[in-house]
């Protein structure tokens, strides 16, 4: 009992709560700005923790992480501009709500789903972290390849009514990902100048395809009176929405947690896998892509589930689940702490304070989210003549901020033109982003697995985890083909 009270006292001390609140608020603002990812936010604000105690510093960084993943949904819903890669799936359906005057409802669904996904990941963090972390360590190159292939199969389900167009777009995304230095042989591929040696970055491409293309489209009718309905009819989800959220978000939150445990698989993958799972569970899969509450709930539950999942291997094994967790390891090291099994023995109170702090951060996030929905939706009442230049500026700043490279700005502009042209011929842009994100992961692990096995393809059928992913791939493809035949 004294241990539990010590944990509660540590997590709920006024100073720690203040730092967590500040972290969540900063994270939401960072996440809502296109191009400023959760990783960038945590990295930029890491120096602020140097003078803090370990508990305050780590929980403030966790607050930034939780807030940024949720914050990406705000611009995704209001402007069709994912603030972070984790919200790319949210933009598909979320923006459809805004177009029909239901932005408040969509933000409410996203906020509650984010909270539920985060809470599910916190429960997993508390209850089964050691066991799940051990499972994640069993992932070899073969398992990572099949995970990436499973993610790529989602392209078939997010392609809308024309699977062929979606598959072509996804293939182009994969092809784009091959530009740069080969990760296995270091051979230079498809590079015209030094700027392409590191490859085509997916964040400028994502900003271009989603945001800049939308800005170009807006320019065409900038003086028209056909504005998006900015009225806020609801600030909370309907009863039916809540039922949908309670059915979908816990499942996708659990999926996101499992994805987060796997090193290298981030919130963007958790979001798309959750989206695809919900589509398979839905009685009305044809509504996905047209403004489905299930779709928004699934995406946000999945990406916020990753936040707790990524902490599991970090704390129990000292292995980062994603880039943010890697920064967290650095923050702990600065405090003189070494993440891993010994941390549970030497600093048990701190570990369980982090567990409880994740729950508190998610609670602060949901309270801030619902409190500010009306403020968020004011963006829609801004005239197009003002909003469009602002979107242009955000796109330029967001694409430049990642590497401070104007070449990325050019990449974003080219992607924007391509996305605008794709919209003209009704080709979905989401498959290209998915291909660009998962293509390198699939290629690298496919080739590494074959190198380790001396070219024997049996390596992809050796373990129960491989068979599990093969079954998921078959199920996903079967469902997509059956849906197209109908």
Where are these regions (language model features)?
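Re-entrant/interfacial helical elements at transmembrane boundaries that shape
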Residues: 38-48, 61, 76-96, 127, ...
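Membrane-embedded alpha-helical modules
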Residues: 108-224, 334-484
